[in-house]
Amino acid sequence: MAVIIKEGNVFDSDADIICHQVNCQGVMGSGVAKEVRERFPNVYEQYRELCELHKNYTAGLLGMAQIVPVYGGRKQLYIANCFGQDKYGYNGAQYTSVGALMEALIYVAEQARQFSWKVAMPYKIGCVRGGADWETVKKIIDVTFKDVDVELWRLEGK
């Protein structure tokens, strides 16, 4: 089992589950989340419904991973909405709660072990839009998924 880095779009993966970080506000407005919203409207709807249920205390979602089944054309595919940040913004601040992202990834890793899933996620998950430190997040991934096959997908030039 290994963590490997691949070049290209995470949606080109043949993994069983694709993880990405989401905020707790019900907004998938940029990055991989926006692509999830466009490719898999049912994932977005279920995400919005969960956020609406927690609208009075959105931070209560932090650390959760919402796993939604979709059909990726070739086989059953799952999308994991990892609640690693409460709010969002584009001002260069850190929005990712590394602890919350870690909790969500631990849950995904447990499911991957149980069902023998291969996992894919964007390279620098929680770091590009969310502002977390990549070295810290990479260590969490290495430890959490030490016995699970994981692909980190890096878009060209990123």
Say what each PLM segment does.
Residues M1-K158:
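Macrodomain-like recognition of ADP-ribose-binding/processing modules
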